Amino acid sequence: MTENIHKHRILILDFGSQYTQLVARRVRELGVYCELWAWDVTEAQIREFNPSGIILSGGPESTTEQDSPRAPDYVFQAGVPVLGVCYGMQTMAMQLGGKVQGSTQREFGYAQVEVLTDSLLVRDIQDDIGTGGAPLLDVWMSHGDKVTAIPADFVTVASTETCHFAIMANEEKRFYGVQFHPEVTHTRQGQRMLERFVLDICRCTPLWTPAKIIEDAVARIREQVGNDRVILGLSGGVDSSVTAMLLHRAIGERLTCVFVDNGLLRLNEASQVMEMFGDHYGLNIIAVPAEDRFLSALAGIDDPETKRKTIGRVFVEVFDEQALSLSDVKWLAQGTIYPDVIESAASATGKAHVIKSHHNVGGLPKEMKMGLVEPLKELFKDEVRKIGLELGLPYDMLYRHPFPGPGLGVRVLGEVKKEYCDLLRRADAIFIEELYKADLYNKVSQAFTVFLPVRSVGVMGDGRKYDWVVSLRAVETIDFMTAHWAHLPYDFLGRVSNRIINEIDGISRVVYDISGKPPATIEWE
């Protein structure tokens, strides 16, 4: 019998902050399971979840507006600790009898908080000591409204020069509010505060560890599928690879993986996937060579969205044919991860995250009555990688830069042709190889090469050449929502350019993309 790793759990109510998923990841990093729900949950749902504590997230709304989101009243009646963050603190204050008002002075960015009153939330946690001997905390603020009167039975724990109620607390009920964001790294002691709340105040035991998550997932897979067979579309990406390894550990040869070589992969990627998972790990894999089929379907198409849809449609067709040929398979496995679940959750209020369609497999034929196995659906990407390491997958594979689902189909601008893909594959391989050799690969968040469907004059020896152009792209980012172009050394860029032009017949010019996001996107299409 496996240990119940969900026994201690934190409920995070989402009021729309861009940082809400970060709160959940920080709680998970403490070894405690948590779930992220829209703010408009019912009392019955909270009771059923049975949280050890509740966190109210930040959000863009103003609590001074009549129709702005509110926490369910039951949150404050459940008898568990509650932590309100930014907007979460404001709605807590207002709902419990305090006052909030709009401020003419927004507080955004770094602030120093002075601790005035002892509180378990921040006891012995400080960045510095003020002139009067009071502990000081370096925090990250992002708010317009602020609490102007705290509820009865609360005390002011900390203040800034412009925000008198920076931390408030009702120690008896274990209710706490912080006007800043402890989940961001700019709040230097933020993780210690979250640790204090989750482990000490909520009394959670850290059970959410990679080894225990694997043990739990294996047990659940075995219970779900019994002695049945399972099919999985294996791409070689992080999510499908970790899903494959979990399923293989749980059911062994009763897993069949389908690897579709669409001709839009990186250099030698198809052979590497087959060698790693087939030869090395001993998984049962069907390799489907489908380059001609994909390229034929893409012929004459230059619109990026149409290309994406075409690639998705053909993949579904190819995968379905393989699935139908395996008559005894009763389960379909997918590498759905927790952010997919969050983003796909429609909320009647419209406050939930943007709805996103899954691109894992798409719609299977109606005649196929298959159950769905999603062993990663509770996990964030960083957790999936840690589990992959625990399962024995190589670090370089798990922490490789992101690669788009449509592959080179959206890195060849305009119409996709085999000639263009072959040139791009080789150019990209040189760029990545040089990044590794210069110890730069792990210092940038994403790097790749783009094929431009324009010809440029070049000189090779005594001759003139008129060949294609590629663009190098490297960015630095924390969350991929915004990004800066990477300031790679000139001599490095020169070396990459020389190698590409000299070693690849068909490319005459190399450029470097120095666009940030915004206004540009990271991928060109």
UniProtKB/Swiss-Prot annotation:
Pathway: Purine metabolism; GMP biosynthesis; GMP from XMP (L-Gln route): step 1/1
Top-rank lineage group of the source organism: Bacteria
CDD domains xref list: GATase1_GMP_Synthase, GMP_synthase_C
Domain Glutamine amidotransferase type-1: 9-207
Swiss-Prot/TrEMBL catalytic activity: XMP + L-glutamine + ATP + H2O = GMP + L-glutamate + AMP + diphosphate + 2 H(+)
UniProt keywords, alphabetically: ATP-binding, Glutamine amidotransferase, GMP biosynthesis, Ligase, Nucleotide-binding, Purine biosynthesis
Top-level EC class as recorded in UniProt: ligase
Annotated positions binding ATP: S235, G236, G237, V238, D239, S240, S241
Ranges of residues in domain GMPS ATP-PPase: 208-400
Active-site residues annotated for this sequence: C86 (nucleophile), H181, E183
Enzyme Commission numbers on file: 6.3.5.2
Gene Ontology CC entries for this record: cytosol
InterPro entries cross-referenced by the UniProt entry: Class_I_gatase-like (IPR029062), GATASE (IPR017926), GMP_synth_C (IPR001674), GMP_synth_GATase (IPR004739), GMP_synthase (IPR022955), GMPS_ATP_PPase_dom (IPR025777), NAD/GMP_synthase (IPR022310), Rossmann-like_a/b/a_fold (IPR014729)
GO molecular function: ATP binding; GMP synthase activity
Oligomer and partners: Homodimer.
NCBIfam families listed in its UniProt record: guaA_Cterm (TIGR00884), guaA_Nterm (TIGR00888), PRK00074.1 (NF000848)
PANTHER family: GMP SYNTHASE [GLUTAMINE-HYDROLYZING], GMP SYNTHASE-RELATED
Biological role stated in the UniProt entry: Catalyzes the synthesis of GMP from XMP.
The name this protein goes by in its record: GMP synthase [glutamine-hydrolyzing]
